[in-house]
Amino acid sequence: MTKNLLSFIIVLISFQAFSQIKGHITDQNNAALPFVNIYIENTFTGTTSNDEGYYELNLNTPATYTIVFQFLGYKTVKKEIEIAKFPYTLNATLAEEQISLNEVVINTDENPADIIMRKAIASRQVNLEKINAFKANFYSRGLIRIKNVPEKFFGQELDDFMVGLDSTRSGILYLSETISEIEYLRPDKLKEKIIASKVSGDNNGFSFNTASDVDFNFYNNTIDLGNQIISPIADYAFNYYDYKLEGVFYDDKGNLINKIKVIPKRENDRIFSGSIYIVEHQWTVYALELAITGVQAQIPPAEVITIKQNFSYSDIDQLWVMISQGIEFSYSLFGFQGDGRYTAVYSNYDFSTEVTKKSFGKEILSFGDSANKKDSTYWNRFRPVPLTDEEIGDYLLKDSIQTVRESKPYLDSIDAKNNRFKIQNLLFGYSYRNSFEDWSIGYSSPLSDFQFNTVQGYNSKLNFYYRKNQDEYRRYLSANASLQYGISDDRLRGTASFIYKFNNIKSPFLMLSGGVETQQFNDAQPISPLINSVSSLFFENNFMKIYDKSFAQAGYTQEITNGFNIYSTLAYERRKSLFNTTDQVFFNDKNDVYSSNDPQNPNIYGIPAFETHQLLKFNLNTRFNFGQEYMSYPDSKINIPNSKYPTLYIGYEKGFAASEKQYNFDKFKARLTQSFNLGNKGNFKYNLKAGTFFNAEDIGLMDYYHPNGNQTHVGTSSNYLNVFNNLPYYALSTNSSYFEMHVEHDFKGLLLSRVPLLNKLNYNLVIGAHAFATENIKPYQEYSIGIDNIGFKKFRFLRVDYVRSYQHGYQGDAVIFGLKFLNIIE
């Protein structure tokens, strides 16, 4: 306790030593004002006040300055000061702005707010293009709080999760800061170099706060919050918003500012509510405070997200630019709840420096030398927004106990508690961990892989694993083994694999595996074991067709250059046909029987689907992520796909040295896929495939190309870009040239939000088209229309589609129930 108190005093003293201009900002009732903008007049040198109303403005030269205090809802205050030496204390008291309608001339023919917003919308593109390029300094602080943490989560104790929380199991979960240099070039180039990074409780941590994550420009038609949210000044904003003029006031430069209330026309549209402040005659944004619910944004964990932006005008540059931004949010999911905020301060804009396309490569984020090693002296000197008492306390507590938490005695004590073997571990799995040496070993629950098929009967798999993490570059060694036993065929099968990851920059992996397993003829696994178990036992439809594979395989994958990856394998395979060994069902239909285990001849029993054979198999696959950008962390490279460009896959597969020459083959394949947003019109995706075989007339069925079918009326994926939902699983399998197309458009509420009653449900309309063509067979097509985002409150894992199929005329239709949560279970 004494040690922490001493540290607290030292921190406060260091604040005093390095604060240049500092002070406290209150209202007329002496209440602290957070998020006040403080800057030097006619410059972009500034800061904001923290939650407790304190601020620090770092200046190097004693001189005469005019300091501006600007806060929404309060009159702007200017104070001219002459500084002879630092530190200098300057407090401010702000009076509430008298916002009135007295000076507004009301036209009874049209809402005055509509007139203002029409002019702002008409000027949107002009204002968007005013800023072509700049360099600036950027500061960010991210904080996430958690409240009332449950003692257990799915039976697991959360004691180690409690560090830094109070007696109510509440407190700061994450606290981090960055100081950066950023460069921008219109329309969408943004590059950031992080000079300093700090994470509470991790002296070696690198913050994930970035300028690109909060690059919200409301002059664009939409704002990207995972989904595209429509701006109140979008070209088509009047289709989504109503507006009300709440009043006007004059800023410190004499500009008339209109306060406009932003009102959603429909409560569940992807739109904001709140206030936007528009400068009269210039029709630019002066400030905004806009909120959106998690339901509107279709972000299940989020309750409310609020964005606050403040702008300042420079007479020198004749520009309005953003000087501060705050993002506040609240969340709740699975019993966890809390809130957080993200504070961003932009300063020292430079519009004169030449910034061109040559200034930008694919790297959008980098770190300076020793960015995570800056000491408290550095932070106390250059941090533009003072820490609150809560944040100071979190840094002191977590930094002081970090050494203890990383020590061997502490980690061993935690492991001793968590590694205790309990009787329930026999059924639900067990994990043993050595945290100090960073390795773990264990096995999974045999219940998680319990399933049924007509070849093995009831069967289960026991998976064993070992993993050793090696260093800060995220190298690791992973070893896995599995044993599967089928009761009906009375056969034990086993596999083993070894994976070594060399680093997290190019992500090279070396993989070795081998053993004996059952494998679906279509190795894309078109039907999951769980769904096949249900369809077999309850409906006597054994759609899964499998064979016995003995194999040994070596593989390697790596990113060669940014956006270009290779994946190659060489394998020995011995394939053997399998037969049904059980006809068990829960509900026996005398008019229905199980089909055989031969996909091509489901009504022929007792004859092998193919002759036992063996071969060597070589695969070389490449992936081109065109336009891919990336973030460079000292220990990692994080790739950022560019939705403006597609991803291209090209592959070559060769079967050779087969026990029978007929099983040798060559195959070339390609795939092109892309997903991109169309603003308020939703999201469009496509997936195109093509391939051809050579010398493949009599190859094994498992080497054919199989378009993924579905005969169960159940879907499990979030989209249907790789499946024909009304096609038998092996009806179009081919060993010749083929072309496959999947197209899907999600309107994201564009149409259903306009339908009375349906617009209350927050559903999304989805349409799709699918086609497959191969030699000597009439082309096959499917067309679908469906509703997505079905569920209750935050849990929206359901989707329903109606599908019609055609092949030389109408073939049939089906209703598909999308149970997306099955992906999580499996």
Language model region names:
Residues 262, 290-294, 439-452, 468, ...:
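Transmembrane beta-strand segments that form the barrel wall of outer-membrane beta-barrel proteins
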Residues 305, 456-460, 490-494, 548-552, ...:
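Residues that define the transmembrane beta-barrel architecture of outer-membrane proteins
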